[in-house]
From Swiss-Prot:
Pfam families: BATS (PF06968), Radical_SAM (PF04055). SUPFAM superfamilies: Radical SAM enzymes. Catalyzes the conversion of dethiobiotin (DTB) to biotin by the insertion of a sulfur atom into dethiobiotin via a radical-based mechanism. Keywords: 2Fe-2S, 4Fe-4S, Biotin biosynthesis, Iron, Iron-sulfur, Metal-binding, S-adenosyl-L-methionine, Transferase. The keyword Iron-sulfur applies. This is Biotin synthase. One of its GO terms (molecular function) is 2 iron, 2 sulfur cluster binding.
Length: 407
């Protein structure tokens, strides 16, 4: 397929695909799916070999968030029966992090519900970061505390944080449909604050909220322009008690296409399969490792994940290897200049240098030779054949409980 050859060539050179090419990946047929995975896999292996980075989530403060994000079980007014607790103490968080590290995690992600941290909260998290680093100096620590105020990113970095996560989640044009208590611009501002403070920026998306193909392409191109080092791709976990509990639009094949498109648009970035991996990819998880080079180990913030040992078996059985603590995740050109990778290299097709980063465009069919025809009108996503509610389980172990964590 000429389209895939073009995308591989561009990915190996870090050139930006067109929006038409990106959308074309999302509308490939099931007959072409393995070809799509193989093509994106060439790009993944070129930049990241066969390594898989393991990340481990520690939910520092769960539930009772004042924001109204419709996808979130911790949102204002959520009726989801999740764990609710206030801030973990540094020694509790450090113990939870140690479980993930012993299970093979290279990065620990410290997450707290809420609009954003107060200065006292930053002090609290700083103490937690120091406790984790004292226990294991080599572990990477990523903070995810919501919207940042001036100076807070710098304080987190001084405390030892390596990265900061704040996802864009969806396209700017549809952001108001999922959240009304803050704006898309607020999120962009926080990612930029992390960049400016010298933290490795991490920002991604959520697929499966009823968005169109154009929305997915739009948010991934916006992420490319923001230039994070890590792009987590979440697949919506429709939790009972949230407004999106009935949104079951994803199939394993759809998830693979989304991951492949993300890899083609962000070829040299850590693409992480995040929440919803087990629920939506299911038995196709091994194929997804040919597209992404990073996953979360064990459980998520409020829902259970696959058993930690099963994650390790998945990686080994698929012919991949866990990235070691001494290995550098990012390609040399990105790792050498933190925050200056994807958009800072030479060449007119550089990541972040494309035209019309926020416009919508698409490609519905090919007119021979890989030429994209005009995009069709946006369509409502088709629901999966049967919602797999049996695969959604609320987390009842690990942080905030007396039970051992899943790592």
């Amino acid at each position: 397929m000429d389209l895939l050859n073009t995308l591989v060539d561009k990915g190996l050179r870090r050139e930006t695909p067109t929006r038409e090419e990106a959308l074309a990946v999302l509308v490939t047929s099931d007959d072409d799916l393995l070809d799509v995975v193989a093509a994106a896999g060439k790009v993944r292996r070129h930049w990241f070999g066969r390594r898989v980075k393991l990340n481990y989530l520690v939910n520092l403060k769960s539930g009772l968030c004042p924001e109204d994000c419709s996808y979130c079980s911790q949102r204002l007014g959520s009726k989801a029966e999740i764990l609710k607790y206030t801030w973990l103490k540094p020694d509790q968080a450090s113990a939870a992090a140690a479980a993930g590290v012993s299970g093979g995690a290279k990065r620990v992600c410290l997450v707290a519900s809420g609009r954003g941290p107060t200065d006292r909260d930053v002090d609290r998290v700083s103490d937690t970061i120091k406790a984790i680093k004292e226990q294991n100096e080599s572990v990477e620590v990523c903070a995810c505390l919501g919207l940042l105020s001036d100076g807070q990113a710098e304080r987190l970095r001084e405390a030892g944080a390596d990265a900061y996560n704040h996802n864009l989640n969806t396209s700017e044009s549809t952001y108001g449909d999922i959240t009304t208590t803050h704006t898309y611009a607020d999120r962009v501002d926080t990612v930029n604050k992390a960049h400016a403070a010298g933290l490795s920026a991490c920002s991604g998306l959520i697929a499966g909220m009823g968005e169109s193909d154009e929305d997915l392409v739009d948010v991934v191109f916006s992420l490319r322009e923001l230039d994070p080092d890590s792009v987590p791709v979440n697949f919506l976990i429709p939790m009972e008690g949230t407004p999106l509990a009935k949104e079951w639009h994803l199939t394993p094949q759809r998830c693979l296409r989304i991951l492949a498109m993300t890899r083609f648009v962000c070829p040299d970035v850590e693409v992480r399969i995040a929440g919803g991996r087990e629920v939506h990819l299911r038995t196709m998880q091994p194929l997804a490792l040919h597209l992404a080079n990073s996953i979360f180990l064990g459980d998520y913030l409020t829902s259970e994940g696959q058993a930690g040992h099963a994650d390790l078996e998945l990686i080994a059985d698929a012919g991949f290897e866990v990235e070691g603590a001494g290995e550098v995740t990012l390609p040399e050109h990105r790792a050498s200049v933190r925050g200056g990778g994807c958009g800072s290299h030479e060449g007119g097709g550089a990541c972040g240098s494309h035209d019309g980063a926020d416009g919508d465009a698409g490609c519905g069919s090919h007119a021979g030779g890989g030429v994209c025809a005009p995009a069709p009108a946006a369509t409502t996503p088709r629901p999966a054949e049967e919602p797999r509610t049996d695969l959604v389980a609320v987390r009842r172990r690990g942080a905030g409980t007396d039970l051992a964590p899943n790592a």
